[in-house]
């Protein structure tokens, strides 16, 4: 019985993850412009309405939307982040070349 409950719990959790991922949408400029996101890796990204960008780890620079995602250019880095907005309002960012896989939400 215990084994069935564990299997059922695992299946339910996996289905929620898959449904959440399926409902995620690429981030839009309006989601970021003028906002700051606090990431689970301890960094804070600020996306200025005029395209300015700052991050506590990667420095200051610019951001813009591209077909591939969010282009970030700072004094230290230049990369495109694949950013999704999840149904619960959190964000998920992946930057394979930098080894970044972070979840965040609007800073309060």
Question: Where are the model-predicted features located?
Answer:
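Bacterial N-terminal signal peptides
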Residues: 9-19
């Amino acid at each position: 019985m215990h084994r069935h409950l564990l299997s059922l719990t695992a299946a339910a959790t996996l289905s929620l993850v898959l449904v959440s991922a399926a409902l995620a949408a690429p981030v839009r400029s309006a989601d970021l412009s003028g906002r700051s996101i606090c990431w689970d890796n301890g960094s804070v990204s600020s996306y200025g309405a005029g395209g300015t960008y700052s991050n506590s780890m990667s420095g200051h620079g610019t951001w813009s939307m591209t077909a591939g995602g969010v282009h970030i250019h700072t004094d230290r880095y230049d990369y495109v982040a694949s950013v999704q907005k999840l149904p619960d309002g959190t964000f998920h960012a992946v930057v394979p070349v930098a080894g970044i896989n972070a979840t965040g939400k609007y800073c309060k």
